[in-house]
Amino acid sequence: MTLLAILATASLVAVPSLTNHTNPISPALIQEETRWHGWIPSGQVVEVNNIHGNVRAELAEGDEIEVIAVKRGFSDPAQVAIDVVEHKGGLTICAVYPDADSAHPFDCRPSHGGGFQLASTSDSTARVRWDNGGGGDVLLNDLRVDFVIRVPKRLRFIGRTIDGDVSAHLLAQDVEAHSVLGDVRVDLSVRQGGEVHAESAKGRVSSEFPLSMRSCGGHGMLAFGRVGHARRILRLKTDAGDIHLRKGAKAFCKRADDGRARRGNQFLVDT
């Protein structure tokens, strides 16, 4: 499989503020942005695995995948890597925090679907196991990573995060969205509908479309049904958050890049 891609990184450091004479300088907030774009064959999957931060998927204007990952925090951005793994089933993207246990190193392992087998966090560590066996034990810091993914309609999408929201805006393909502590939001039209299965273990499910709703013993909610006639599947799941399905109008967000054509595998760093 041929992959044409670019990975560019830019860092912005906020100016430290002067507070008082006894504590003259507060820590500087650091923001670093990583961009990637490339092409994979039709019918494959684009999946994003995050730990601390949001994942938002949008329909791409063109035929390439576009990825924007923004790190924010006071720690060194190099402590969290953005891994892009090309494989025969598609593309897997992970926010990779430092390993906490050499016996369980983090594995950005590709999958074909599914959520979390295990996801637990403390103040300093997280234990993550996906259904496919990937994940690991990692050290947490104050860095969060927010992803925006633009996906061509010919590709499937899977988004996962622990502490953050997962949202899909007017995607026209199969979608899986999994969060542990955050919400799941999906905007779609009747024409872009499909078979919906939404489950919140401790929260609620709200829908602007007619779906069958079932309470899970007063501690969660399940919603299922079909929207329109599209032959696609939307699997939405959260543990502690809510799920929202809303009617959306076709619109594209303004491109965040300068629109210049880019080809080849390379790193561009601007600090």
Residue ranges and their predicted role:
Residues 60-62, 87, 191-192:
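Short strand-connecting beta-turns/loops that link adjacent beta-strands
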Residues 44, 53, 65, 155, ...:
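Short beta-strand/loop motifs in extracellular/secreted proteins, especially
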Residues 49-83:
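N-terminal, post-signal-peptide region of Sec/Tat-exported proteins
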Residues 26-41, 68-70, 77, 96, ...:
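Short, surface-exposed interaction patches in beta-rich subdomains
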Residues 35-41, 45, 83-174, 222-237, ...:
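Right-handed parallel beta-helix
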Residues 24-56, 60, 162:
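N-terminal segments that cap or nucleate solenoid repeat domains
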Residues 53-54, 164-165, 182-184:
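Short beta-turn/strand-loop junction motif enriched in small, turn-promoting residues
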Residues 2-8, 13-34, 106-140, 248-271:
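Gly/Pro-rich, low-complexity intrinsically disordered segments
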